[in-house]
Design a protein with these regions (language model features):
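Short glycine-rich anion-binding loops that position phosphate/pyrophosphate groups of nucleotides
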Residues: 10, 67-69, 90-92, 177-179
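N-terminal glycine-rich "phosphate-gripper" loop used for MgATP/nucleotide binding
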Residues: 63-67, 75-76
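A short helix->loop->beta-strand "cap" motif at the edges of active sites that frequently abuts
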Residues: 30, 79-82
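ATP/nucleoside-binding phosphotransfer catalytic cores, i.e., glycine-rich phosphate-binding loops
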Residues: 135, 143, 148, 159-162, ...
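Short glycine/serine/threonine-rich phosphate/pyrophosphate-binding segments
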Residues: 14-15, 69-73, 180-185
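Catalytic core of DAGKc-family lipid kinases
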Residues: 90-169
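ATP/NTP phosphate-donor binding region
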Residues: 1-60, 72, 100-116, 126-135
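Gly/Ser/Thr-rich active-site loops/lids in small-molecule metabolic enzymes
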Residues: 165-168, 173-209
Length: 284
């Protein structure tokens, strides 16, 4: 099998762990490639490098890091339909499993085709600005104020039906995957990964009656940002772009999925309890 490994800023103890993982993969007869990004901080002249242009040959890609690395990996893969195995050596790693747990076992399971392939939906932004070459996000697309403490004013429509006008610091359009991220921090609910929904969550709304709305993921969201004298940001996961003046955007579910490799015994609610202390109560 052919596997690529992507990572960002791998130093110290992480280098030792990565060296051990590469040695294990080679021992199990994998052909291993490193991303150009990873080679900036982890250089091994014996291992070939890959770029976004030649990843279609891979059986899967290992995202070695935390959730930020996995989002970076998703950006590089895009529509290429390559499976991702998230290996957490970062802080939280909600979308990855901890490297210290079961790496060798899951590699054996992958060779035996004994794993679960979890399809995660994404959201896309239209129109595509000339400065935006990748208009999709696994977690969320957010519109956020930038240069001022003043609020921004966003008119929101779902399937051409007017919802309301948000006076706020911004607005988050989240997938089920992203429901445990930025949206959750802003008071949004948690959706299970297989949910066929999107979330609209305001950021610090001036109207206390405004809360998250759950809509079907077949819906098309139109946002009209009123003209103002300050810049604002449109962020897609970790990538941000600056806009000014009145703008109109369409946000909808992407026409492709991301495929995450999970152990057969993967339990979403166990992950919530373990990594977010969900339901933790000193009385239990």
């Amino acid at each position: 099998m052919i596997v690529g490994i992507n990572g960002i800023n791998i130093r110290g103890e992480k280098k030792k762990i990565l060296s051990s993982l590469i040695a294990l993969l080679k021992e199990k007869k994998f052909e291993v490639y490193l991303s150009e990004e990873l080679s900036k901080t982890f250089n091994d002249s014996k291992i070939k490098l890959y770029s976004e242009n030649n990843i279609s040959k891979f059986d899967f890609i290992i995202s070695f890091g935390g959730d930020g690395t996995l989002l970076n990996t998703v950006t590089s893969i895009g529509r290429k339909n390559i499976k991702i195995l998230g290996v957490n050596v970062g802080k939280l790693g909600f979308l990855s499993f901890d490297v210290y747990d079961v790496f060798e076992k899951i590699i054996d399971d992958i060779q035996k085709n004994n794993y679960t392939l979890e399809k995660r939906s994404l959201v896309s932004l239209l129109p595509v600005n000339e400065n935006i070459n990748k208009n999709f996000a696994l977690n969320e697309i957010s519109v956020v104020k930038k240069d001022s403490s003043s609020m921004i004013k966003i008119h929101c429509y779902v399937d051409n039906q007017f919802i309301c006008t948000y006076w706020s610091d911004g607005l988050i359009i989240s997938t089920p995957t992203g429901s445990t991220g930025y949206s959750l921090s802003c008071g949004g609910p948690i959706l299970t990964p297989e949910s066929k929904n999107l979330l609209i969550t305001p950021i610090s709304p001036h109207n206390l009656s405004l809360r998250s709305i759950i809509i079907p993921d077949s819906a098309k969201i139109k946002l009209i940002i009123e003209k103002q004298k300050y810049n604002f940001l449109v962020s897609m996961d970790s990538r941000s772009y600056t806009f000014r003046g009145e703008q109109e955007f369409i946000i909808k579910k992407s026409n492709f999925n991301i495929n995450l490799i999970q152990p057969n015994n993967f339990d979403f609610f166990e992950t919530l309890r373990k990594k977010l202390n969900w339901g933790f109560d000193i009385r239990n």
